[in-house]
């Protein structure tokens, strides 16, 4: 299946605890249909001290979110949009915003 959401895209969360939050996709995990988004689904990880130089503590990091709970933000209109695909005259397959019909640069 083609990737509708890619690293670097701006997305909005459409359901779940963080509904309405926007962020940049940091990493996509296609095997699990999940993506890590900056500032969304922040989880606390408790770390034990590791040796003399590294103290323990609580570290916050983003947890993966299901791709079905994310919607791409159209760069032209700055609104959430569904994503389609179009094959250009030169044979390249590109992502297209369904709302505006604009090609989404990758």
From Swiss-Prot:
Belongs to the universal ribosomal protein uL24 family. Part of the 50S ribosomal subunit. This is Large ribosomal subunit protein uL24. InterPro entries: KOW, Rib_uL2_dom2, Ribosomal_uL24, Ribosomal_uL24_CS, Ribosomal_uL24_KOW, Translation_prot_SH3-like_sf. Keywords: Ribonucleoprotein, Ribosomal protein, RNA-binding, rRNA-binding. Disulfide bonds: none annotated. GO terms for molecular function: rRNA binding; structural constituent of ribosome. The keyword RNA-binding applies. Coiled coil: none annotated. It holds the Pfam family KOW. The gene is rplX. One of two assembly initiator proteins, it binds directly to the 5'-end of the 23S rRNA, where it nucleates assembly of the 50S subunit. One of the proteins that surrounds the polypeptide exit tunnel on the outside of the subunit. Gene3D superfamilies: 2.30.30.30. One of its GO terms (biological process) is translation. PROSITE patterns: RIBOSOMAL_L24. HAMAP family: Ribosomal_uL24_B. GO terms for cellular component: ribonucleoprotein complex; ribosome. It comes from Granulibacter bethesdensis (strain ATCC BAA-1260 / CGDNIH1).
């Amino acid at each position: 299946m083609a990737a509708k959401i890619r690293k670097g895209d701006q997305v909005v969360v459409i359901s779940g605890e963080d509904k309405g939050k926007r962020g940049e996709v940091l990493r996509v995990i296609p095997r699990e249909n999940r993506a890590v988004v900056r500032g969304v689904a922040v989880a606390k990880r408790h770390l034990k001290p590791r040796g003399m130089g590294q103290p323990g503590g609580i570290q916050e990091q983003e947890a993966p979110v299901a791709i079905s709970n994310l919607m791409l933000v159209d760069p032209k209109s700055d609104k959430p949009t569904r994503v389609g695909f179009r094959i250009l005259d030169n044979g390249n397959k590109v992502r297209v915003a369904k709302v505006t019909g604009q090609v989404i640069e990758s």
